[in-house]
Amino acid sequence: MATKCELFGIRKKGYIEDILETVGLEGVGKKKTKHFSLGMKQRLGIGLALVGEPDLLVLDEPINGLDPQGIAEVRDTIQRLRDERNMTILISSHILEELSKIATDYGIIHNGSLLQELTSEELMKRCSERIEIELIHPEQAVPILDRMGFTNYQVTD
């Protein structure tokens, strides 16, 4: 991290310590990174990305391969950056359950193309729980569902 600070011309006393504190690594001292857990290494990588104080942070699968504690630590770091620094964070991940705990907006990409952009509320509505019922006469289900007050349903043959 010191080398990257040097490359950016940053010589402010305590700068590295502030970044380490931001990513929850304030207590590591001179500990060698080879002794870091995977979660600690992920947070160190985020810390390195923070050198120079960017407005946008891009993270590719930041929780992939982490144990539950590591996931929680990285999630807390991301939330802290979002809330305390008002930072925009673009996360590429296939783990929607975990993203739902921190994301405000989603972009669905398939084969390199952006298919759809959704707010977290829109995504939750589209992914809400559902039941599937097989009926002999599915057309008879519509009036019953309407009388029961259901509005978000689909009847298929």
Regions found by a protein language model. Give the residues of each.
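ABC transporter nucleotide-binding domains
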Residues: 1-91, 96-110, 114-116
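Short, solvent-exposed coil/turn segments
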Residues: 18, 126-128
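Short, surface-exposed, polar/charged, turn-prone segments marking secondary-structure boundaries
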Residues: 85-87, 117-119, 134-137, 144
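Short acidic-hydrophobic catalytic motif
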Residues: 121-125
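Short, charged/small-residue-rich alpha-helical element at the C-terminal edge
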Residues: 129-157
